[in-house]
């Protein structure tokens, strides 16, 4: 029935800040963009960020969590820190495995987990 995930959409309050975080700092390539919209390829999953319009009652940053797997969490955190992205929590090593939490410019959680 379903073949694959097409995209996941989020609301952002500021497209340039979203682009800087997801493209410049995290390194995801742009699939499509215009003045009100940004789509990036996050390891095969397309993440879409758009500005809320007058009829859109979604609050930027309140609509989800992005989880990303990394081979080496400590190395990933060090690399991200060198680019100005700091973990706001962790790293932790618990029943869920080894993980840390980042936040994007809208306050959305980005969880990094070690494989």
Task: Give the predicted meaning of each segment.
Residues 12, 42, 70:
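Aromatic-flanked redox-active Cys/Sec active sites in thiol-based oxidoreductases
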Residues 29-63, 109-114:
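Conserved short beta-strand elements that form part of the metal-binding/catalytic scaffold
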Residues 27-32, 87-91:
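Short secondary-structure junctions
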Residues 1-17, 46, 64-66:
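N-terminal beta-strand motif that seeds the catalytic metal site of vicinal oxygen chelate
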Residues 18-23, 80, 107:
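Conserved active-site tyrosine of GNAT-family acetyltransferases
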Residues 66-77, 85:
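Mid-chain, well-packed structural core segment of small domains
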Residues 82-115:
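Vicinal oxygen chelate
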